[in-house]
Amino acid sequence: MSVVEEATDDALYPIAVLIDELRNEDVTLRLNSIRKLSTIALALGVERTRNELIQFLTDTIYDEDEVLLVLAEQLGNFTPLVGGPDHVHCLLLPLENLATVEETVVRDKAVESLRKIADKHSSASLEEHFVPMLRRLATGDWFTSRTSACGLFSVVYPRVSPAIKSELKSMFRTLCRDDTPMVRRAAAAKLGEFAKVFEKTAVIEGLHSSLTDLHVDEQDSVRLLTVESAIAFGTLLDKANKKKLIEPILIELFDDKSWRVRYMVAEKLIEIQNVLGEDMDTTHLVNMYTNLLKDPEGEVRCAATQRLQEFALNLPEDKRQNIICNSLLNVAKELVTDGNQLVKSELAGVIMGLAPLIGKEQTVSELLPIYMQLLNDQTPEVRLNIISSLDKVNEVIGAAQLSTSLLPAIVGLAEDGKWRVRLAIVQFMPLLASQLGQEFFDEKLLPLCLNWLTDHVFSIREASTLIMKELTQKFGGQWASTNIVPKMQKLQKDTNYLQRMTCLFCLNTLSEAMTQEQILKEIMPIVKDLVEDDVPNVRFNAAKSLKRIGKNLTPSTLTSEVKPLLEKLGKDSDFDVRYFSEEAKNSLGL
């Protein structure tokens, strides 16, 4: 919503009250008034807003952080309320003050607003008003102002004269050498962004020395931010300069003494690969990556493992299979027994993504042993992640290998103690059914599917009813009549009402995959019986089932078979049963 629209909505709000609330001792009232600042400004008009309201806000800027945060945000949208771009510079002073406060979130919001209004300044106005403010911030006594200054260079630089550009470069380089680590950190964070607005020919001369200094800074919190900056530089430089100036910096960061820097390298690995990959010796890059996979710090191994599949995919196609089998998988085999569960969990999520890259033969000989080991890991998340990549294996190894190698483990996990693992297996049954065929499925897997219908966890029961529809669509209605309906008839008589409800849920999904004749012959007799159930919850679920099943029947069948049952339920003693019966009748037009 625009400032003007918001102000119109609040047009009747007493302006005098809002102005009084700006001075109120109660922080809640001040906060409320600051949020309505645009309403006050609109009522005052642009001239009084510039001369009185902005002056008032500038003078009384010492307040609770939450008030200052809202104020910093509001001022970023104030350009039309002070008379447009010609007068936008009047917003600089209050935002400059906010950019120097102690609270980081307030400073960041003030910088965000300053960046927004910088765009509203003409080039002349930038030089006359914005640059002097930036100069004051960059040379301020307090580190807070110098920190904020770092975020403003990139929005000013492209639109000022060469002389001022030269001054801005010098100012930024000074901030990169600041005595305070927080300022150097802010400069390192914005270095790449600043480089992107430079003339390409000036990047090396203007900023490369700062990158070189910052990547060997004594503070690891500064060095880790140069990873992203170095990547940004790499995208800007030609091949020769990238090789000469950026590659050595990134290589040093790979081996940094601080695990936090190495973690950042692992996080940004694919971007580094994209920047250096074509021009760097592949073996060298792979060696540096495998060192990250073997890093003594678990967090680094975790981040590096996460990127295994994508790193492999980005390798040169002619060398890819050889590198995966001879380098990456050797390290992956060690990670299977890693002491850190998170590392194993990440490995389980990506390892089978290598299958399409190395082909069937290598998948069977190299990946399946890893897969089987992870499938039997003691950590539930590891088992869950490896099961979730079953489809990737399927595509490569085919049904015969699947049935002999993986099936025993899958059957074992069907009764896993962790319900999420069981759920993952349930959800893969339709995929296995299509791969293995009906005969094999009926013999080995159908009993599992039927057992899940009585699982003690609702999510498993629900998921198993949903896959029955997919299985019926694959194998046909007659298959369901032979294999599923007898189980439904058994559940229909179960003493536990939850099982009788599961029976109804399953019939709902089955009906969508069966013909009308099969529904009338196989499903309706069971529903008719459950309409008479002693438990109201079962009866109202029977009404809901009739609503779903009825959508697969012709109007004449609805009238003869479904309507009498719903009318009977409509006279039930239980309110919920009557409600759902009426809802079903309305939905089916009965």
Swiss-Prot record:
A biological process from GO: spindle assembly
Main location: cytoplasm
GO cellular component terms given for this protein: centrosome; cytoplasm; cytosol; mitotic spindle; nuclear envelope; nucleus; P granule; protein phosphatase type 2A complex
Effects seen without this gene: RNAi-mediated knockdown causes severe embryonic lethality. Causes a failure to duplicate centrioles resulting in the formation of monopolar spindles at the 2-cell embryonic stage. sas-5 protein levels are reduced in embryos. The few surviving animals lack a vulva resulting from defects in vulva cell induction, vulva precursor cell (VPC) generation and in vulval execution linage. Partially suppresses multivulva formation in a let-60 n1046 mutant background.
Per-repeat ranges for HEAT: 37-73, 74-111, 113-150, 151-188, 189-227, 228-266, 267-305, 306-344, 349-387, 388-426, 427-465, 466-504, 505-543, 544-582
Record-level Gene Ontology MF annotations: DEAD/H-box RNA helicase binding; protein phosphatase regulator activity
Pfam family, any one: PPP2R1A-like_HEAT
Similarity section: Belongs to the phosphatase 2A regulatory subunit A family.
Domain remarks: Each HEAT repeat appears to consist of two alpha helices joined by a hydrophilic region, the intrarepeat loop. The repeat units may be arranged laterally to form a rod-like structure.
Localization of this protein: Cytoplasm, Cytoskeleton, Microtubule organizing center, Centrosome; Cytoplasm, Cytoskeleton, Spindle
Protein task: Acts as a scaffolding protein for phosphatase let-92 and its regulatory subunits. Probably together with let-92 and regulatory subunit sur-6, regulates centriole duplication, microtubule outgrowth and mitotic spindle stability during early embryonic cell division by preventing the degradation of sas-5 and kinase zyg-1. During vulva development, may play a role with phosphatase let-92 and regulatory subunit sur-6 in the induction of vulva cell precursors by positively regulating let-60/Ras-MAP kinase signaling, probably by promoting lin-45 activation.
Protein's recorded name: Probable serine/threonine-protein phosphatase PP2A regulatory subunit
Subunit structure: Part of a complex consisting of a common heterodimeric core enzyme, composed of catalytic subunit let-92 and constant regulatory subunit paa-1, that associates with a variety of regulatory subunits which confer distinct properties to the holoenzyme. Interacts with rsa-1.
Keywords: Cytoplasm, Cytoskeleton, Repeat
Gene3D superfamilies named in the record: Leucine-rich Repeat Variant (1.25.10.10)
